[in-house]
């Protein structure tokens, strides 16, 4: 497994290009993979070539988040698939990036408890649209990773993958997001490991019921090793069951970045924990 991070945990000096600067910093930290976004720059082909060239020279594998709303129906769904496919194909033509993660759709407005069509119907819509997206980008060697994005439980994501039935539609497992849908993270990992090709490593401190001033169940973002996600056990599950554990990316990511958090320290703590406790899995 290859250790990396998402881009928002890396800070760069003011005036530095945010993507190029983060590639340099990731390499300086000894990481192997960096998750970035190119949604605002994918039409600038010269820029894509610069990004790809720097990443190759610094030996950083780049993975992107595609985004998209795959709950749409009819012509709206077809247009959304075409929009995302156009972006991914353009990026692939000018870079070595061949993996893009995506949620099913906007998690704040659509999830397993959202009123509306039955859950099974919603999941089938996502499967149909992602099947079309996978077909549209397969010729370029692109793999799509559907993430459990604070919306579905592991077995539900697995059902979507199985229904879509495309070899280049796999999973980006987020280890901490399981808590957001009241699921044990290791149960989620067991359900998704056979499809997982990328992973957001996340830790969350859980309080089953907090007192005043904020009553109720709490899930708080913390650096790796300071919460209740058993990421070492999850990595063992992935080692045993993932299709290609040696090439599986482990990207450190916060559940959210607390207002008073120092991103650099958050990442440093997470990297140090990973290199100690996940050493048997890292390549």
For each of these PLM feature ranges, what is it?
Residues 1-11, 16-27, 154-168, 179-283:
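Histidine-acidic metal/acid-base catalytic patches
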Residues 1-95, 268-283:
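N-terminal pre-domain/capping segments
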Residues 2-4, 29-32, 66-69, 110-114, ...:
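A short alpha-helix capping/helix-coil boundary motif
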Residues 2-8, 34-36, 62-66, 100-102, ...:
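Hydrophobic faces of well-ordered beta-strands that scaffold small-molecule active sites
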Residues 6-10, 37-41, 67-71, 105-107, ...:
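Active-site beta-loop-alpha junctions enriched in small/polar residues
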Residues 15, 44, 77-81, 115-122, ...:
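Residue-level preference for long, well-ordered alpha-helices that form the structural scaffold
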Residues 43, 109, 208:
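Short glycine-rich, flexible loops that bind phosphorylated cofactors or substrates
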Residues 56-61, 74-170:
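Active-site acidic/histidine proton-transfer and metal-coordination neighborhood
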């Amino acid at each position: 497994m290859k250790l990396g991070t998402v881009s928002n945990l890396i800070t760069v000096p003011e005036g530095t290009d945010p993507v190029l600067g983060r590639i340099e910093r990731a390499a300086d930290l000894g990481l192997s993979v960096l998750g970035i976004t190119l949604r605002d720059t994918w039409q600038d082909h010269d820029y894509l070539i610069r990004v790809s060239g720097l990443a190759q020279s610094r030996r950083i594998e780049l993975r992107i988040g595609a985004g998209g709303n795959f709950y749409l129906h009819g012509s709206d769904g077809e247009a959304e698939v075409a929009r995302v496919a156009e972006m991914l194909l353009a990026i692939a033509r000018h870079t070595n990036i061949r993996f893009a993660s995506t949620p099913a759709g906007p998690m704040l407005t659509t999830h397993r408890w959202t009123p509306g069509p039955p859950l099974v119907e919603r999941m089938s819509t996502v499967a149909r649209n992602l099947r079309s997206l996978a077909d549209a980008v397969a010729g370029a060697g692109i793999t799509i990773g559907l993430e459990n994005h604070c919306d579905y439980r592991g077995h539900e994501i697995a059902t979507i993958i199985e229904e879509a039935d495309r070899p280049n539609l796999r999973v980006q497992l987020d280890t901490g997001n399981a808590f957001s849908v009241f699921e044990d993270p290791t149960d989620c990992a067991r359900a998704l490991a056979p499809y997982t090709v990328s992973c957001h490593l996340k830790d969350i401190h859980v309080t089953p019921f907090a007192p005043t001033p904020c009553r109720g169940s709490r899930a708080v973002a913390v650096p790796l090793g300071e919460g209740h996600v058993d990421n070492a056990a999850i990595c063992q599950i992935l080692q045993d069951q993932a299709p290609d554990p040696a090439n599986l990316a482990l990207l450190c990511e916060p559940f959210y970045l607390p207002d008073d958090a120092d991103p650099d320290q958050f990442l440093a703590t997470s990297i140090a924990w990973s290199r100690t406790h996940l050493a048997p899995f890292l390549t």
